[in-house]
Design a protein with these regions (language model features):
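Conserved catalytic core of the tyrosine transesterase superfamily
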Residues: 1-279
Length: 279
């Protein structure tokens, strides 16, 4: 079985059946494409540890550590899947996966978010930034939202694993939403649309919009739509929010995933201790 066919089989029999996210599917396809480009579409039975070692070295030239790790991990998952159905391939336990370097999420203060919103060059930009921060939703979830879906400052999204999740917005977000929608003259059902063709905005367009707003606000951090999700979570805990409630709001399947935000708050406590404790 060719490498490309092996990844395809994994997608069809595992990802789609398990209702995995589009992000998981995209990562699988990117890993397959990159591996085939490097090794050629050889039989996966002939894939060796040396192939993987050389591929990993090649990835490190122009990919981030997280991307390298993600690609190697995805290959290991696919081979593990084949191994379990008695396919003649490399033992997945022999494939070394680079360790994830521990890092705290980048987040913005409430003041920085407010500066970003005010730096938005139109009401659509202000609404998008405000919505991402107020609700903590993912970029992919924002793109799928439709007009009329937010009622009484509440709405439901379908998150990872096709699970519905209740989300909320604040009055500031509602204000910018109403301003933006009042300007719209198109018939698109999408909540946010491109000014050029009035179709649903793409992830790339929104990422660029957020990055430019951060630059105009004078923020030096690397800001993405996901940074606003991190900011929502961090500031929720800083205001003594309950970790389990936060996990539900974020749509995390495990409380362990949400717990990474407690480390940011722990850092706050340590800084306060160092600043105010005197011997």
């Amino acid at each position: 079985m060719k490498i490309s066919a092996a990844f395809k089989l994994y997608e069809e029999q595992y990802i789609e059946v398990k209702n995995q996210s589009l992000r998981t599917l995209e990562m699988s396809r990117l890993a397959a494409r990159n591996l085939v480009k490097f090794t050629g579409d050889i039989d996966i039975e002939n894939l060796t540890l040396n192939h993987i070692y050389l591929w990993k070295k090649n990835l490190a030239i122009n990919k981030t550590e997280n991307t390298c790790r993600g690609y190697i991990l995805k290959l290991r998952v696919v081979i593990s899947f084949l191994y379990k159905i008695n396919h003649n391939c490399l033992n997945p336990d022999l494939i070394p996966v680079p360790k994830r370097e521990p890092s705290l999420p980048i987040f913005l203060t409430r003041e920085e978010v407010s500066h970003m919103i005010q730096s938005g060059h139109n009401n659509r930009t202000k609404f998008i930034i405000s919505l991402l921060y107020a609700s903590g939703i993912r970029l992919s979830e924002l793109i799928k939202l439709n007009r009329g879906q937010i009622i009484d400052n509440k709405f439901t999204v379908i998150g990872k694993g096709k699970k519905p999740r209740l989300c909320f917005i604040d009055e500031r977000t509602r204000y910018y939403m109403e301003l933006y929608l009042s300007e719209r003259a198109d018939n698109s059902e999408a909540l946010v649309v491109s000014y050029e063709n009035k179709t649903r905005m793409t992830a790339t367009n929104i990422q660029l919009l957020v990055r430019n707003a951060a630059k105009r606000a004078g923020i030096k951090k690397h800001v993405t739509p996901h940074t606003l999700r991190h900011s929502f979570a961090t500031n929720f805990l800083r205001n003594n929010g309950n970790l389990r409630y936060l996990s539900t709001l974020l749509g995390h399947s495990s409380l362990d995933t949400t717990a990474m935000y407690t480390h940011v708050v722990d850092n706050d406590l340590e800084q306060q201790y160092q600043r105010y404790h005197s011997i």
